[in-house]
Regions:
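Exoplasmic/lumenal regions adjacent to the first transmembrane segment
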Residues: 2-337, 342, 349-384, 388, ...
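Transmembrane alpha-helical segments and their boundary/interface "anchor" motifs
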Residues: 252-262, 335-342, 381-384, 388-390, ...
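Solvent-exposed interhelical
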Residues: 201, 501-527, 576-593
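Hydrophobic core of alpha-helical transmembrane segments in multi-pass integral membrane proteins
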Residues: 254-270, 444, 525-537, 597-611, ...
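Membrane-proximal cytoplasmic C-terminal regulatory module of class A 7TM GPCRs
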Residues: 312-319, 654-657, 685, 690-695, ...
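Alpha-helical transmembrane segments of multi-pass integral membrane proteins
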Residues: 563, 567, 571-573, 594-718
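Interfacial loop-to-helix transition and helix-capping segments at the boundaries
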Residues: 192, 240-257, 297-303, 330-336, ...
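Hydrophobic transmembrane alpha-helices
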Residues: 265, 393-401, 439, 443, ...
Length: 735
């Protein structure tokens, strides 16, 4: 019994000791996280602010750090200039609560201050993104979802995770144009626009905040204006909310309708395939009780409708895209590789180009582009001439090989040739138009979306340009106008290609009847484009610098009168190859030398712009003659491949894989700027131009664009190509 009492006594003593230890630990833990009002409830925070308010609304007492905050923090400066005459009572009250919360170091108010933008370093080289943190502003409104153990000592105020603002806050961005002489002005797009992110009370309207900002920058309180002579001017403000008008846009309805109609046709094509593969084809498409399917069944029993619907057969179209077969006689396999590689190459350039409006070291980005190592990226626009050369070659080559059509042109009268010309134009438009128009509608929607929700100032507002100038794109004449007024301005080359197609067909029709006249017109066109290029280049003082290239874009870069040169060179090469029976009669060793020489000239033309301040005459000479030489090297590759010769690198370009990629090249060309611009604009922070990171980003964009191109090609390109073949030959074109 005594032993039992002894053990009870010992256990009781240990329990008391343990309880004391727990209390001490809890007390210590509470001490570690106890920072007076900082860790109190929201009511306590509000009480502190209220008591501070009662100490005097107009008190002249100023804390030591208050002048610094006024001049360095835009959000704090706005709280100081706010009064009852320039903002609503609720906005005024909430801004003053923010001000006093910052001065009394309330955690929620410090988070507001921290989430709002201030000037970062790098202004001289283009850092205009004072965005603060959108996520941190959201953290002011609601506790951050993170679990931290209290068993470890921390120096932080624990309530910065838990304490919320006593009223609604939201993140907005205000845009100011500056005129500072202390920032490198490149004159490529609109770079002198400050982006200032502000975590503001929701009670403050955008117009009120804009007026407060005007008062703040005009009051000499903006320290950065004193240092960098910014002379800021308020442009506009975004609340980063999607406009209610977005879903009312005509393009939204048209794109949705196109998707629904295409989807319905694909479903019908699939049902048709199932019925044809069934044991009893007369069974029909659907159960008897479904009136909709019965109506569809009766409609699809008509042979013309079946042929039309079969153009949208997803399985067949995928087989055509993915097919990789042996090269057929008369085909020129190197064209697949040239188109595919150049499409990805141009995509790489667009990654850099559309990075420009989100990068905060623009000067260094262009500096990298001028370095020798990165010339292959910065001169990628020259590769558009590869497509023009191939188009000119194929247009002439196919026309001259089609003896039946050639004879028809010779025998037809004027009206007969006009009808034939219209037929060719219709089929060209049918193959190119649907995907192009859907992408154009998608561009309008995408830029309307990012114009509302992106933190970045979007220089090229295609959602404003497309509703005004859509008809130019529909007619493929957008490149005849100012390049800054284009809807989807990267489509200028598609307009050029359509215009060259029309002109080439006119000359070829003339050639069928009067060969000498057609040859004279072709040579005259060649001389005219060279003369025009020299004249316009000298007049506009053209240089290879990026600012000069951008500002002379309408006169030179997108002008069909300048860009027609490689198309003519390709057409002449095709005429020599087809009509003159041009053959490569030389030794294998010499043939290899010419192949390698063509590659060296090709690369040399790419790197010819490494020095960009050579003077106008030398620059325009390099531009014109270099492009002519560049096109000749492409023609050599095409003719050499058609003749069956080649070397190791040309055999790589003739690989079967490029057949697949070539079928997607049109979609890749149309989609890559849209995808790249959309992804960049939806980020919440600016990025730095870093060569290694850029290479990784290029790989990522290549995969995304490739997958998007498959989807768009299956839906909006291949079905209409099948339809064109159906109308021409009576059945869809097979692989």
């Amino acid at each position: 019994m005594e032993s039992h009492c002894k053990w009870v006594l010992i256990i009781g003593i240990w329990a008391l000791v343990a309880d004391a230890a727990v209390n001490d630990t809890a007390s210590l833990r509470q001490h570690r996280y106890d920072y007076g009002p900082f860790n109190g409830s929201l009511e306590l925070a509000t009480d502190v602010i209220t008591s501070d308010t009662k100490r005097g609304e107009g008190s002249a007492v100023q804390l030591p750090h208050e002048p610094h905050l006024i001049r360095s923090s835009v959000i704090f400066g706005l709280t100081k200039v706010a009064n009852e005459s320039n903002v609503s009572p609720s906005c005024h009250n909430h801004l003053k609560l923010v001000q006093r919360g910052v001065l009394s170091k309330q955690p929620w108010a410090i988070k507001v201050l921290d989430a709002s933008g201030t000037k970062p370093s790098g202004f001289v080289f283009g850092q205009n993104y004072w965005l603060g943190s959108r996520e941190a502003c959201h953290g002011v409104q609601r506790p951050v979802g993170i679990t931290l153990s209290r068993h470890y000592e921390r120096v932080m105020h624990y309530s910065i995770l838990t304490q919320s603002a006593p009223f609604e806050m939201d993140y907005r961005v205000i845009y100011l144009r500056h005129r500072s002489p202390w920032q490198v002005e490149i004159k490529v797009m609109s770079e002198q626009v400050l982006h200032i992110g502000l975590c503001l009370p929701s009670s403050c309207g955008s117009e009120e905040v804009k007026q407060l900002t005007r008062d703040y920058v005009a009051d000499s309180s903006f320290a950065e204006d004193d240092i960098f002579d910014m002379k800021p001017e308020v442009l506009y403000m975004k609340d980063l909310q999607l406009s209610a008008n977005f879903f009312q846009r005509l393009t939204f309805r048209l794109v949705v309708a196109a998707i629904l109609v295409t989807g319905a046709l694909m479903v019908c094509a699939q049902q048709l395939r199932v019925v044809k593969g069934a044991d009893d084809p007369d069974q029909g498409l659907a159960p008897v009780e479904s009136e909709l399917w019965q109506a569809m069944d009766s409609l699809l029993k008509r042979e013309p409708v079946q042929k039309f619907v079969s153009c949208f057969d997803l399985a067949n179209n995928w087989k055509k895209i993915a097919a990789m077969r042996p090269n057929q006689p008369g085909e020129i396999p190197i064209m697949n590789g040239l188109r595919s590689v150049c499409a990805i190459w141009i995509l790489t350039f667009h990654v850099m180009w559309y990075m420009y409006f989100t990068v905060h070291n623009k000067t260094l980005l262009l500096s990298y582009a001028e370095q020798l190592f990165f010339q292959y990226v910065s001169t990628a626009p020259l590769l558009v001439d590869v497509f023009f050369t191939i188009s000119g070659f194929l247009q002439t080559y196919n026309f001259l090989r089609n003896t039946k059509q050639l004879e028809a042109v010779r025998l037809n009268g004027l009206w007969g040739n006009v009808k034939l010309f219209g037929k060719l134009l219709f089929h060209r438009y049918l193959r190119l138009g649907p995907l192009y128009l859907v992408v154009m509608g998608s561009v309008d929607l995408a830029f309307a979306y990012i114009g509302d929700v992106s933190v970045f100032h979007i220089n090229e507002r295609f959602d404003e340009l497309c509703p005004q100038y859509w008809w130019r794109n529909v007619l493929f004449i957008q490149n005849l106008f100012d390049h800054q007024e284009m809807c989807a301005n990267w489509s200028w080359s598609l307009a050029c290609d359509m215009q060259f197609f029309l002109l080439a067909n006119i000359v070829l029709f003339i050639y069928a009847k009067q060969p000498k006249l057609a040859k004279g017109l072709t040579l005259s066109g060649l001389v005219a484009t060279i003369t025009w290029s020299y004249g316009i280049g000298i007049t506009s003082k053209f240089e290879f610098s990026f600012d000069s290239t951008y500002l002379t874009g309408t006169q030179i870069y997108t002008s069909p009168f300048v860009r027609v040169l490689p198309y003519i060179v390709g057409a002449i090469a095709a005429w020599f190859f087809q009509e003159k029976g041009f053959q490569l009669e030389m030794s294998e060793r010499r043939t290899r030398r010419y192949w390698h020489l063509s590659l060296k000239v090709f690369v040399g033309c790419i790197y010819a712009t490494v020095k960009r301040d050579l003077g106008t005459l030398i620059t325009i000479s390099l531009f014109v003659l270099g492009r002519g030489l560049f096109s000749l090297t492409v023609c050599w590759m095409i003719v050499g491949s058609a003749a069956g010769t080649g070397v190791w690198w040309s055999r790589l370009l003739e690989a079967k894989f490029f057949q697949h990629l070539n079928r997607l090249s049109y979609a890749i060309y149309l989609l890559n700027p849209l995808v790249i611009a959309l992804v960049y604009s939806l980020t919440n922070t600016s990025s730095a131009a870093d060569p290694f990171l850029l290479s990784v980003v290029c790989c990522g964009f290549s995969i995304i664009v490739y997958l998007a191109s498959i989807a768009f090609s299956l839906a909006f390109e291949l079905p209409y190509s099948n339809l064109s073949s159906l109308l021409l030959k009576g059945k869809p074109k097979t692989s």
